UniProtKB/Swiss-Prot annotation:
Catalytic residues of the enzyme: C248
Motif (UFC1-binding sequence (UFC)): 390-405
Protein name as annotated: Ubiquitin-like modifier-activating enzyme 5
Domain description: The UFC1-binding sequence (UFC) motif mediates interaction with UFC1.
Subunit structure: Homodimer; homodimerization is required for UFM1 activation. Interacts (via UIS motif) with UFM1; binds UFM1 via a trans-binding mechanism in which UFM1 interacts with distinct sites in both subunits of the UBA5 homodimer. Interacts (via C-terminus) with UFC1.
Keywords: ATP-binding, Cytoplasm, Endoplasmic reticulum, Golgi apparatus, Membrane, Metal-binding, Nucleotide-binding, Nucleus, Ubl conjugation pathway, Zinc
Biased composition regions of type Basic and acidic residues, renumbered to the chain: 7-24
Amino acid sequence: MATVEELQTRVKQLEEELERERTRNRGGTDGGGGRKKIDQMSSEVVDSNPYSRLMALKRMGIVDNYERIRDFTVAIVGVGGVGSVTAEMLTRCGIGKLLLFDYDKVELANMNRLFFQPHQAGLSKVQAAEITLRDINPDVEFETHNYNITTVDNFQHFMDRISHGHLKGDRPVDLVLSCVDNFEARMAINTACNEQGQVWIESGVSENAVSGHIQVIKPGETACFACAPPLVVASGIDEKTLKREGVCAASLPTTMGIVAGFLVQNTLKYLLEFGSVTYYLGYNAMQDFFPSMAMKPNPNCDDSFCTKLQTEYQEKLLAQPKEEAKEETVEEVVHDANDWGIELVAETTEEELKAASHGHVPELVEGVHVAYVRPMTQEDEEGAAGLTVDDQESLEDLMAKMKSI
């Protein structure tokens, strides 16, 4: 049972939260974080500008127009270990509006993760998140929903909010981020997004807390969550029957933070159109392994909306004008006597070969050839020019002349 001091502390916290809400409802410019709302982002480098380092991305040529981030609306489903950090990162980046969905409450068991604080125990996660996030950045607009999206009534309301809850009016949100920890909620998000053709990013951390992943899902273009479901989903097993009393999944704030970082990084690249969006990125902490791939949709997917969108996407591709095939310039093979196109060049020059061909070649028996002919020197040429041979003299006469010398 709570002590008097604990109750008094709790009352004080609630009074502070109530005062923040009153200030916000009165239209005050102070968002609760001690600074006034900023109407327009500035790149001015001063200590009082919370956006100066973000706007530096423009100066460095990374993003063309970072200010556009204030025009985007993102829905985050699940405000736990990954979702709360994701919401915080997007808030610090200056996102226009966040829709937060979660039915759970903050517990002391959540303190091993990031974001939540012990004094927030007992508050709903979406309420605690909104209070903290408003203090961080009062320029962001928040919309919170404290319910389970998998029930029939709540599912319909969830679909309505992601299709009409945009910052700019009655239109769909720009992106849905799944940060839930169960397959039932993932399938609900998958169904809603397939039905509305909504792009979303799924994320998850393993039960042993040392691996995780993110997956971008564009209905009809990439594989949805039902195209290649986990074994638990494919087998039709109720997840609730797998839980045991006194047993819980492991949780590391490091893995949660890494997966949340990947999720937000991909979100920024998708919204602000810079870099390459990774359609699937995994993380294995044991080997520091980061696999990435693109997953094609399953033509036999159980979700009828997915197969319908696949057909529409293929028809759209066929309707696009075909790109003319570019003629590839084939490099001329230097030397076709080998597989590498290597040109064989002799070390002896043409002049040296020509000079060598005039040298003296001795008479050898058949089958034996000289390997090298000594080029004729100038003295050899002069001697050869002054040498005359009389073919009329016999061998005996020549020998007689030699003896007389």
